[in-house]
UniProtKB/Swiss-Prot annotation:
Belongs to the staphylococcal tandem lipoprotein family. It is found in: Cell membrane. This is Uncharacterized lipoprotein SERP2443. It comes from the Bacteria. InterPro entries: Csa, Csa_sf. A lipid is attached at C20 (N-palmitoyl cysteine). Transmembrane segments: none annotated. It comes from Staphylococcus epidermidis (strain ATCC 35984 / DSM 28319 / BCRC 17069 / CCUG 31568 / BM 3577 / RP62A). One of its GO terms (cellular component) is plasma membrane. A lipid is attached at C20 (S-diacylglycerol cysteine). NCBIfam families: SA_tandem_lipo. It is a lipid-anchor.
């Protein structure tokens, strides 16, 4: 299902991709630099003092809210898709952080149609520690939540400039843009993901940097990363991550 959706999107962009050369690739990298420069931020409380991109969407008194999220999704061949991840809303006005850990499973309903079953577990962050705010049904899940680390805490993109020959797409009408790179299993970030997750394939991933909004900067729109290990009709394994700065009144709606 996810595979077919992405194929449709890529086909619709084929006409727009042509003509995107090294200049556009450089522009996309520069657009992502401010976000990727935050990797790694080991202490999440450092976000209370980090400034983000501000425009007319922000109230002058609003210091803004950072949203960080990381999710691993695995769909083994012949089995259902399962996603496990966490989102935090780091409010710079109140210097408080809350969010949720979630588990989403794709299953069949009584009529054989695919449906998503998602369970959320509310959390808060204090002294760089994740704390569940409601009782957790089992100790294993509780430890999984308490020990969770966001990719922004350990990822590192200091060698982004060395990524070459990316598959570049740009649609000025949306606007949206992306750059995709084939990585090796020796890549630092790939090693870090394999260290933290049980990834059931030796296949090296592709890194996709994707965003929407003005390439020159805007608080409207979003940027995200995706490490895709396997993507086809029968099997999907990918890790997604994002860091976004938003007006506080809109960040938790």
């Amino acid at each position: 299902m996810r595979y077919l959706k992405k194929v449709t999107i890529y086909i619709s962009l084929l006409i727009l991709v042509s003509g995107c050369g090294n200049g556009k690739e450089t522009e996309i990298k520069q657009n992502f630099n401010k976000m990727l420069d935050m990797y790694p931020t080991k202490n999440l409380e450092d976000f209370y003092d980090k400034e983000g991109y501000r425009d007319e969407e922000f109230d002058k008194k609003d210091k803004g809210t950072w949203i960080v999220g990381s999710t691993m999704t695995i769909e083994p061949k012949g089995k259902y898709m399962e996603s496990r991840g966490m989102f935090l809303y780091i409010n710079r006005n109140t210097r408080t952080t809350k969010g949720y850990y979630y588990v989403r499973k794709t299953t069949d309903d009584s009529k054989g149609r695919l449906k998503d079953d998602e369970k959320r577990y509310p959390v808060k962050m204090e002294h760089n520690k994740i704390i569940p705010t409601k009782p957790i049904p089992n100790d294993k899940l509780k430890k999984e939540i308490e020990n969770f680390k966001f990719f922004v805490q350990y990822g590192d993109f200091k060698n982004l400039k060395d990524y070459k020959d990316g598959d570049i797409s740009y649609n000025p009408n949306v606007p949206s843009y992306s750059a995709k790179y084939q990585l090796s299993n020796n890549d630092y970030n790939v090693k870090q993901l394999r260290k933290r997750y049980d990834i059931p394939t030796n296949q090296a991933p592709k890194l996709l940097l994707k965003g929407d909004g003005d390439l020159k900067g805007s608080s409207i729109g979003s940027k995200s990363l995706e490490f895709t290990f396997i993507e086809n009709k029968e099997e999907n394994i990918f890790f997604s991550d994002g860091v976004q700065f938003t007006p506080s009144e809109d960040s938790e709606s």
